[in-house]
Amino acid sequence: MIETIVEQDFNRLFEIEQAAHLVPWSKGTLLNNQGAKYLNLKYTEQDNIIAFAICQTLLDEATLFNLAVDPAFQAQGYAKKLLTALINQLQARGISTLWLEVRQSNTIAQKLYDSVGFNQITIRKNYYPMPDGSRENAVIMALYL
């Protein structure tokens, strides 16, 4: 089931965030990316949150800031289902473009985004921090709705 994120979800979202990302967001960052200008969704399976999406909207554009799936549920199609639901809801709100940034090394995510119609726009050099203190490039992608 895909639903809007509520405050009671944040402990579970934080668990997923810590497990799913190389350099995860803090709980504070998760909490700060909420409110009227966001469309944030969770994917629940048998009353267990297994994935979430954090998306900010501004006028007729949106930016997908975070998409995370519990590692135990990765590679099973949940990210694509959640992303498709997000895209459909954004279209219903009159959003014309969905933007995102993804680590250049995250080819699995890039394939997911390609599969729903995203286009690579450019590379942002040295954007993402790495655990060793170095930086990694970001691939900027856009989906025209």
Swiss-Prot record:
The keyword Acyltransferase applies. InterPro entries: AcTrfase_RimI/Ard1, Acyl_CoA_acyltransferase, GNAT_dom, RimI, YpeA/RimI_acetyltransf. Its EC number is 2.3.1.266. Pfam families: Acetyltransf_1 (PF00583). It is found in: Cytoplasm. It comes from the Bacteria. Keywords: Acyltransferase, Cytoplasm, Transferase. It is an enzyme of class 2 (transferase). NCBIfam families: PRK09491.1, rimI. PANTHER family: ACETYLTRANSFERASE, ACETYLTRANSFERASE YPEA. This is [Ribosomal protein bS18]-alanine N-acetyltransferase. It comes from Haemophilus ducreyi (strain 35000HP / ATCC 700724).
